[in-house]
């Protein structure tokens, strides 16, 4: 079982992911851990844009948007993830995981959102920055995530139909959000039997 978590900037994606990983005793992969794994396996230099979140704006990005679902660029997320984590059960934060595993039955694709004010305050606390800096982080990060996701998937980032479950983590908190995801996984597993 894989659970992929995409999220708006300032949501508790890493924290929710860690709670889930601890509960089901599987590894948590995010940009940092995947980048470290790619370095160890010697593939980081082959996919610098995939680990960067800034491929858009290049000529290749424009071509990739119109190159069809089976383009080399659109296959990159799955190819990289297969090389790094294979069939391992895990929690995967970002990296277009929802797209990479969209055709798999044993995957739950989650998108976390939150009210802007809560996300700003979370970033202010987490990064010890002022309000205007947190707002700038949100704008810059979300712009990059949208471009990154479109570049690698041809899909709109955050569009509900691309996920199995969309949750406002502001309403439920970290533990409550993890509870909802776990209940969804449990219900899906029960239906498959």
Where does each model-flagged region fall?
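Short loop/helix-cap segments at secondary-structure boundaries that form the rim of catalytic
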Residues: 99-105, 160
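Small-molecule kinase domains that catalyze NTP-dependent phosphoryl transfer to phosphate-bearing small molecules
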Residues: 56-58, 130-175
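Conserved phosphate-donor/acceptor-positioning beta-strand/loop module used by diverse small-molecule
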Residues: 103-126, 131-141
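Glycine-rich phosphate-binding P-loop
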Residues: 4-18
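Short, polar loop motifs at secondary-structure junctions
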Residues: 94-98
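Short beta-strand-centered segment that lines the nucleotide-binding/catalytic pocket of NTP-utilizing
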Residues: 27-39
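Short, amphipathic alpha-helical "lid/cap" segments that border enzyme active or binding sites
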Residues: 78, 174-182
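ATP-dependent small-molecule kinase phosphotransfer cores
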Residues: 38-89, 129
